[in-house]
């Protein structure tokens, strides 16, 4: 995001409420296998992309930059996986025998908890962890502000104590 775009957003957001504004971006990291951590997904590998998130466009676009997408299975946000979904995935694996499954971390957590996931899916499943990065040094401002806010207070549930008051007692 350009500095000009950041200034425009700040101007608009400050009309709503006085608050600090920090700009971040989401950065994908290396794909991970939830069942076999030693396995790796290599750039250019064939993948079947599956997601059950609200707006999968950015996820799919990012995957296409790194891997060869041979099929997509896009589901609704908060999708509850069924045996029919797992059977559909198995059919896609039969059609694309070299493909791996690449999904979001959110969907991988759901599938990892299920006892019904067939071995072929476990063997080929990877997820794409995401990392949040601050844009243009705003992390220093964020962490500096957070440190300043925390330096004067200790929070214990609903009880807030000022450190200076405790020191003087």
Q: Model regions: which residues?
A:
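ATP-dependent carboxylate-amine ligase
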Residues: 1-169
């Amino acid at each position: 995001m350009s500095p000009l775009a950041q200034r425009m957003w700040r101007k608009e957001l400050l009309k709503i409420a006085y608050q600090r504004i920090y700009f971040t971006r989401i950065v994908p990291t290396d794909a991970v296998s939830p069942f076999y951590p030693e396995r790796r997904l290599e750039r250019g590998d064939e993948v079947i992309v599956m997601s059950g998130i609200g707006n999968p466009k950015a996820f799919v676009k990012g995957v296409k930059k790194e891997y060869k997408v041979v099929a997509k299975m896009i589901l609704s946000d908060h999708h509850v996986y069924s045996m029919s979904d797992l059977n559909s995935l198995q059919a896609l694996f039969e059609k694309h025998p070299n493909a791996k499954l690449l999904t979001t971390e959110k969907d991988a957590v759901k599938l990892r908890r299920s006892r019904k996931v067939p071995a072929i899916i476990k063997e080929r499943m990877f997820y794409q962890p995401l990392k949040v990065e601050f844009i243009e040094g705003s992390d220093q401002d964020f962490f500096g502000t957070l440190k300043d806010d925390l330096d004067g207070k200790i929070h214990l549930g609903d009880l807030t104590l000022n450190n200076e008051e405790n020191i003087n007692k």
